[in-house]
Amino acid sequence: MSKDNKNIVITSAVRTAIGTFRGSLKDMQASDLGALITKAAMEKSNLNSNDVDELIMGQVLTGTAGQNPARQAAIQAGISIEKTAYVINQVCGSGLRSVAAGYQAIMSNDSKIIIA
């Protein structure tokens, strides 16, 4: 590591419930679940929604979710419409890739606070 690396920390960990295909969560939209966990992550970290620079959400089955479910979740969670949000679909690796993308955005000075 170079001498000018930043100290980047994960301040909380929250995830959606794990369900089964066509199970008890089938009537919930991914954006609604995303909004719930985004609010929970902000609460656990004592973050104001205005502090968040970007939301990166891992989602695999996006077929009926509408345009950019991460953006929908961010807006529902109270994150400003001026902030960015996007979905990563990398099957089983979507969540981990979201965290890695958040780290990269912070390291490159594109963002300071990311929810992934």
Which positions does each model-derived feature cover?
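Active-site nucleophile and cofactor-binding loops and adjacent substrate-binding regions
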Residues: 66, 85-94
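Short, conserved beta-strand segments within well-ordered enzyme catalytic domains
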Residues: 54-56, 87, 114
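Conserved "HGTGT" condensation-loop signature of ketosynthase/thiolase-family condensing enzymes
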Residues: 1-83
